[in-house]
Amino acid sequence: MPKRLDINTILVIGSGPIVIGQAAEFDYSGTQACQSLKEEGYKVILVNSNPATIMTDTATADKVYIEPLTLEFVSRIIRKERPDAILPTLGGQTGLNMAVELAKSGVLEECGVEILGTKLSAIEQAEDRDLFRTLMQDLNEPTPPSEIIHNLDEAYGFVNEIGYPVIVRPAFTLGGTGGGICHNEEELIEIVTSGLKHSPVTQCLLEKSIAGCKEIEYEVMRDSNDNAIVVCNMENIDPVGVHTGDSIVVAPSQTLSDREYQMLRNTSLRIIRALGIEGGCNVQLALDPYSFQYYVIEVNPRVSRSSALASKATGYPIAKLAAKIAVGLTLDEIVNPVTQKTYACFEPALDYVVSKIPRWPFDKFESANRTLGTQMKATGEVMSIGRNLEESLLKAVRSLELGIYHLELDHLKELDKETMKKRIIKADDERLFIVAEAIRQGVTKEEINEWCEMDFFFLQKVENIVNMEREVKANVGNMEVLQTAKEMGFSDHYIAAAWNKTEREIYDMRKENNMTPVFKMVDTCAAEFESATPYYYSTYADENESIVTDRKSVVVLGSGPIRIGQGVEFDYATVHSVWAIKEAGYEAIIINNNPETVSTDFSISDKLYFEPLTIEDVMHIIDLEKPEGVIVQFGGQTAINLAAKLEEHGVKILGTSLEDLDRAEDRDKFEAALTKLGIPQPVGKTATTVEQAVAIAEEIGYPVLVRPSYVLGGRAMEIVYRQEELLHYMKNAVKVHADHPVLIDRYMVGKEIEVDAISDGENVFIPGIMEHIERAGVHSGDSIGVYPPQSLSEKLKEQIIEHTIALGKGLNIVGLLNIQFVVFKDQVYVIEVNPRASRTVPFLSKITGVPMANVATKVILGQNLVEQGYGTGYHPEEKEVYVKAPVFSFAKLRSVDTTLGPEMKSTGEVMGKDLTLEKALYKGLVASGINIPTHGSVIITVADKDKEEAMEIAKRFHEIGYNLLATAGTAQSLAEQNIPVQVVNKIDSEEYNLLDIIRQGKAQFVINTLTKGKQPARDGFRIRRESVENGVACLTSLDTTRAILRVLESMTFSAHSMKEITQTKRHEVVHA
């Protein structure tokens, strides 16, 4: 069937900010879809609220709207642009929910807009638990015994009939939000209440737990002609009970017999056909390991996290083809872009094993509950490819960037059998490592299988790795053993430790013995047809398939998995750098290991290597390709951390030299550079012992800001107000010694300013200056950023520009630099300089029209700023106001404190733009998920140090008609200022108290700055968590509160009696 000619304009709905459960995979799928539709000649309009993506670049669609993904704003765009159709199935759960909302509101019918791809009825049938269960019954497909419930009484009824454990699955939610497994009544009350609250239709499915079954996924495609294929089938190493986004997944499935594979394949195709899905779809199934009994768990009627993984695992571009199917093309008409010979109706075949391991944020949130269940907690994931499962798994482990090079963690060696048993049964992020440790300690596979029902096949693979460890240790220097270990994926780092040598010595030993890996191609067809894709993985085998050309090449290091502090912004910079390298006439080679991102789409670079970002794996590629050099400044801290080791291997680092990188990162060298340039900075010193730290803090005076050197995302950074807090930090947050000093600065309570600039060593160009709403002390990634600055005097702006130019030249920066300043008592101080791409690069690039990563790359390759038409100075400011607001995933991470501080906690960002600050802030806050009602109640509980400041805020809330609620201490302060307030009981009161008000939704905002104790059980922590669990905006910074007040005041009409107005005027005359 040819493509449709009755439609011209298509609106694509993006997925919004990155949150746990919905990460960079939708930037990848959305970008592919927009390009795919443009290829077919359609006019594409895109709406998305996330400025950090390639998808929201102006080149991706014909028109790009970076606006909140709410009914109000999307309807406005539809009425203005009048598209013929919308495509919502590439925007994750956000896109689907938006489509349902638009249809129900009547706006699609009013404007004559059709939904493309999967029909609305199919979306609802797959997403609505009741409709889906009915369809499965009609198809005679087994689902676990279940019941749809809308309240707790119905839940009790089901449990009384079926017994515990039961799984709670809320309808229309993302990443299992609000769901979980209930083993008793207490858990049932908590999880069902939470699930009903998070479901937009107040509906949950309660089902008998089938935890322990194998979890299998099929990624399927279907077109309007009813052609349907399986793109990839995948198997979770963790049995049912752990969310698939938190499971270690392998592809293709490893433990299914042919009969089981065909049975589940047929089921998946039968379901996609019955639903009438047109495009990509993900089917999740549970298989009893001891019989052929299976159950259908759920269907995602859209492109998902799993489809991004399946696309990268097979090379088959699901999103690209789903977009073509949406406009009427069929699988037998679409040429497979990988082979460029076969058609898209050929099912991919794999001659390798792919492993995916999730990347969790627990290194950031040590107090978080690490237990894994049906609610997703991972922020990102890594993927690796090998010729056997052992190799594939070990490559994935060292891709995680946790400083781990093998399936072993030192701190687990102390665990006794009972503790290991408990943790293996319960499942947390370290389960696979504990399984390996248990096998090392002599626990049998049978016992482990009994504890967690992990398949014997996977346990055998872990045992193979453990047995090989013993071989390696028993045969020091044996080349045959080394060869076997390398074939199994062992790293040089592990072997070096076992043989008491350096990693470099093992590397040299291998090279002398011609023991190097070859590179194989990912081609969708198991080498049956010739492939046109330059997409490779390493393995120890015979034939090398990566042909080196005679063109000059440049390697760009990617940024690895998405995690807090290093998000999709770095992938954005990486992709733009690759494009610039190609424009400059070089061959662009990228090394990365994140299956969710645009940078690992094989069509972006000239060559893509899907490999761990370790010195060993990167050097294998450099040894083969012999590039002109390596660019490290776009891959975040991941790439910067490799620079020194690469230079030791004789590799040329392009752009800012290693010496100058070190000068910006090393505290003493940086201080010396600032002193030489005459640029002030907060008083600070470096401590290498606890005693030194205490002495320095006494000398410069509390409060102090403490942090380790060389960090990203403010990891282990804290503001401490007294000695006991400092001692707690030194003991628990960092391991301080001569190689890892701790930096201690005077903490200045001032306005924070952030600048991104490009330097060629002679000229320094500044695209933009941003002002943070929150004062210094809140991490820049968690602050609301405003461009252009709204409250900076021209004099201060000139100082900032002068300092930036001086730093760019003085530090010999070639490429990008990011500087954070604090304005304190009308003086500008430098807090830090990052000689690399920052997370504000996409935001500023989009606003100013300066493609910063592209310009910086060309500078790195030798084209100076003047030749590119820029030169030195500050780019003229835009007229509109732009706001970058952070987005948090606290609802997914139980027992994490939501207080903002110098350690970064946000997972994503949104942008709001308008003619005034108030309007831009409104859009930014609404897009980030904060509801801004014009009236209601606000609970105020603040620390003593904030009481004076809180009075002015309380008064302003009262002025616009809000009710004020406060506990006794704060209430008394308000009453003394004649501000009406209702006293509420503290949280330890037996009677109706503050937490009850939050639980019952009787407060719209909670302002809480209670001193954060080191024990999370403190009152403030409980208030903040209760707010998050109940979807109430909890403001822990008075600066953020003021920003919200500005918005509320601009939305609210004043209501003053004439007498009040007259009195005010008379007062002004008297004081004139």
UniProtKB/Swiss-Prot annotation:
Binding site for ATP 1: R129, R169, G175, G176, K208, I210, E215, G241, V242, H243, Q284, E298
Residues at which Mg(2+) 2 binds: E298, N300
Superkingdom to which the source organism belongs: Bacteria
Cofactor(s) named in the record: Mg(2+); Mn(2+)
Pathway membership: Amino-acid biosynthesis; L-arginine biosynthesis; carbamoyl phosphate from bicarbonate: step 1/1; Pyrimidine metabolism; UMP biosynthesis via de novo pathway; (S)-dihydroorotate from bicarbonate: step 1/3
Location of region: Carbamoyl phosphate synthetic domain: 547-929
Cofactor comment text: Binds 4 Mg(2+) or Mn(2+) ions per subunit.
Residues given in the record as Mg(2+) 4 binding sites: E832, N834
Record's catalysed reaction(s): hydrogencarbonate + L-glutamine + 2 ATP + H2O = carbamoyl phosphate + L-glutamate + 2 ADP + phosphate + 2 H(+)
Record-listed Mg(2+) 3 binding positions: Q820, E832
A molecular-function term among this protein's GO annotations: carbamoyl-phosphate synthase (glutamine-hydrolyzing) activity
Pfam hit, one: CPSase_L_D2
Binding site for Mn(2+) 2: E298, N300
Function, in words: Large subunit of the glutamine-dependent carbamoyl phosphate synthetase (CPSase). CPSase catalyzes the formation of carbamoyl phosphate from the ammonia moiety of glutamine, carbonate, and phosphate donated by ATP, constituting the first step of 2 biosynthetic pathways, one leading to arginine and/or urea and the other to pyrimidine nucleotides.
Assembly: Composed of two chains; the small (or glutamine) chain promotes the hydrolysis of glutamine to ammonia, which is used by the large (or ammonia) chain to synthesize carbamoyl phosphate. Tetramer of heterodimers (alpha,beta)4.
HAMAP family documented for this protein: CPSase_L_chain_A (MF_01210_A), CPSase_L_chain_B (MF_01210_B)
The protein's name in its UniProt record: Carbamoyl phosphate synthase large chain
Organism: Bacillus cereus (strain AH187)
Gene expressing this chain: carB
